[in-house]
Amino acid sequence: MKEQKLIHEGLITESLPNGMFRVRLDNEDLILGYISGRIRRSFIRILPGDRVKIEMSRYDSTRGRIIYRLRKKDSND
């Protein structure tokens, strides 16, 4: 049986090496996010200040996989 993933929205605050980012979630948690393979293959640029959807395991709440970059009009701001 596949593990259920939690999906949150957040804001990229810092860019780190090797496709890693510091992400501030909407619930004010600060986690480490890495780019999913689909985003990496599509050459989607993610910069500090972008809003993203991030998928987290329920077992490790300090890391997550960035699965979608929200457009400016898609975000809730």
From Swiss-Prot:
Keyword annotations: Chloroplast, Initiation factor, Plastid, Protein biosynthesis, RNA-binding, rRNA-binding
Classification via Gene3D superfamilies: Nucleic acid-binding proteins
Localization, UniProt: Plastid, Chloroplast
Keyword RNA-binding listed: yes
GO molecular function, one term: translation initiation factor activity
GO cellular component, one term: chloroplast
Disulfide bonds: none
Protein family: Belongs to the IF-1 family.
Role of this protein: One of the essential components for the initiation of protein synthesis. Stabilizes the binding of IF-2 and IF-3 on the 30S subunit to which N-formylmethionyl-tRNA(fMet) subsequently binds. Helps modulate mRNA selection, yielding the 30S pre-initiation complex (PIC). Upon addition of the 50S ribosomal subunit IF-1, IF-2 and IF-3 are released leaving the mature 70S translation initiation complex.
Name of the protein this chain belongs to: Translation initiation factor IF-1, chloroplastic
